[in-house]
Amino acid sequence: METEELTIGRVHHGRNIRRTRIEKNMNQEGLSELVHLSQPAVSKYEKMKVIDDEMLQRFARALNVPFDYLKTLEEDRKSVV
């Protein structure tokens, strides 16, 4: 259980969404259309450390990546400022 808690501590759902969106050459407006949210709402989600599973699933489908990718991808400590 302690290992799981440590892993969760290094996961940032919003940054995972942002990183994936950028890798796919998509802007927030384009993603907002796919998830049926406003661009400011997408921006807000990209800043959230924890996002509920239902919303994370919507982003995963829109970005065409597995749900677990967004849910469990750990931050690269070198890239965190």
Question: Which residues does each PLM region occupy?
Answer:
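A short, Lys/Arg-rich alpha-helix, primarily the initiator
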Residues: M1-E23
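Short basic helix-loop element that most often maps to the first helix and adjoining turn
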Residues: R15-L34, R58
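Key DNA-contact positions within bacterial/archaeal DNA-binding proteins
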Residues: E29, P40, D68
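Recognition helix of helix-turn-helix/homeodomain-like DNA-binding domains
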Residues: E33-I51, T72
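Short, basic-rich loop-to-helix N-cap that marks the start of a DNA-contacting helix
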Residues: M48-R61, F67
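Short Cys/His-rich micro-motifs in 6-15 aa windows
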Residues: E75
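Conserved small/polar residues in nucleotide/adenosyl-binding loops
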Residues: K78-V81
